[in-house]
């Protein structure tokens, strides 16, 4: 299936020198602690909580509308500690997700309306289907599909998943064009 052009109003997005496109309607708390490594798209009404701990996002990632990305925390007897959140390259996070993971590897697809529980680890080349809720501290192995509530193993992915995710994220970025370039 070929992706059509996705047009956006240039005044509604900020484009950085490294090619990141961030919606002006998104909220980046503690932006000095948020690193977007390049050609990443953050769409409208997203929230990235860099004020809690460092958030690092790799290259060619897409965070779609109304998703929340926040670092994981752990409760201790003396209070709460937040830990950095690392997201790899070529990660696609669909609409309405809440991501509270410790780590998301590269070439990962998170479906619509998912909740990734605190301190989850999503290894490279995995997929989380729509409406999945992963319990805290779940580890999703490489080349697996998780679905349901609670999120459980439901299938495997082919060895070409890495190439597929590279194609998807790069083509999405190339087709995400300002209205003036049409």
Swiss-Prot record:
UniProt cross-references to InterPro entries, sorted A to Z = DCTN5, Trimer_LpxA-like_sf
Which keywords label this protein? Acetylation, Centromere, Chromosome, Cytoplasm, Cytoskeleton, Kinetochore
On whether Phosphoprotein is a keyword of this UniProt record, the answer is no
Predominant cellular place of this UniProt entry's protein = cytoplasm
Has the keyword NAD been applied to this entry?
Answer: no
Q: Describe its function.
A: Part of the dynactin complex that activates the molecular motor dynein for ultra-processive transport along microtubules.
Q: Which family does it belong to?
A: Belongs to the dynactin subunits 5/6 family. Dynactin subunit 5 subfamily.
Subunit details for this protein? Subunit of dynactin, a multiprotein complex part of a tripartite complex with dynein and a adapter, such as BICDL1, BICD2 or HOOK3. The dynactin complex is built around ACTR1A/ACTB filament and consists of an actin-related filament composed of a shoulder domain, a pointed end and a barbed end. Its length is defined by its flexible shoulder domain. The soulder is composed of 2 DCTN1 subunits, 4 DCTN2 and 2 DCTN3. The 4 DCNT2 (via N-terminus) bind the ACTR1A filament and act as molecular rulers to determine the length. The pointed end is important for binding dynein-dynactin cargo adapters.
The name this protein carries in UniProt is Dynactin subunit 5
